[in-house]
Amino acid sequence: MANSGAKKRKTQNEKELFKVRLIMAAGTIPYILYRVVYHSETFGGWLWFAYLSLNALNMFAYYIITSMCKLTYDNNGELIDGGSDLNQGGMTEYYFDIIYVCCIIQGLGLISDKCLYLILVIPAFAIFKIWKTFIGPYLASRNQQQQQPQEEKSKRREKMEKKQEKQKVKYVK
């Protein structure tokens, strides 16, 4: 039997998914009506590619979001788990951002075809986050590891030099 938290999460996720579907429809339907239907003679080539890639990104992000909030039922059909909380941070925020950016780009695409180049913001941001999160710290730690043995050698050399200086003093009997 589901607790009240799972039921609340289920209704909250359903509301959030409904809002996302509305946003996707608000971005896609005007674009189809204006660019594909009304200006069909100028809609071709790379515009089809841009439109399909925007929708592919939208559908990919929406699929991931819906799979995250998948409900779990027991054998009796009662709700066990309401799925993940869609208001949590982490990757969920990025999937929502992908949907929002794609819809904004489609809206701007009604004004000018050149606005569709803004789709490059998504992979640019992904590369930036990967660099900042994984590659940059890896390279920084690697450089520090290479510098540490050199520093240790210099400390050893300093100790050896100090010992040699001390041994230069001769005792007279």
Swiss-Prot record:
Cellular component GO terms held in the UniProt record:
endoplasmic reticulum membrane; intracellular membrane-bounded organelle; vacuole
Chief location category: endoplasmic reticulum
List the residue ranges of the region (Disordered).
Answer: 142-173
Transmembrane spans? 17-39, 45-65, 91-111
Q: Keywords of this protein's UniProt record, alphabetized?
A: Endoplasmic reticulum, Membrane, Transmembrane, Transmembrane helix
One Gene Ontology BP term is:
vacuolar protein processing
**Stated name of the protein:** Transmembrane protein 208 homolog
Organism, scientific name: Dictyostelium discoideum
Q: Which gene encodes it?
A: tmem208
